[in-house]
Amino acid sequence: MASIIFTAKDIFDQDFKREVRGYSKSEVDEFLDDIIKDYETYAALVKELREENRRLKEELAAKPVEKAPVQPTQPVQSTQATQSTVESFSQMTSATNFDILKRLNRLEKEVFGKQILDRE
């Protein structure tokens, strides 16, 4: 985080060298007056926010930790429907696995059976 280089007082007390073809002194003064006002506003805002931050931290530290009650995600009535769905899915999976094993066995017989015949 960048630090603030000038305070409102530093800007107010700054003197510029005067030259023949220099800037308009009144214009520079008006501009610097606006900058000073901005700095004062920023300083007040930072002070206010720091105070609010401190107050909120104190409130948070003083507040006891509350745990939210755990609620079931599904109603009890739908649990039986879910169990029957799981059972039917596992039956489909085992049937699918059995079909895959049969196909694999048949392919192995074709591939390795030919290799055994070729060796003889």
Swiss-Prot record:
The keyword Cytoplasm applies. Disulfide bonds: none annotated. It comes from the Bacteria. Its main location: cytoplasm. GO terms for biological process: cell division; regulation of cell shape. It is found in: Cytoplasm. Belongs to the GpsB family. Forms polymers through the coiled coil domains. Interacts with PBP1, MreC and EzrA. This is Cell cycle protein GpsB.
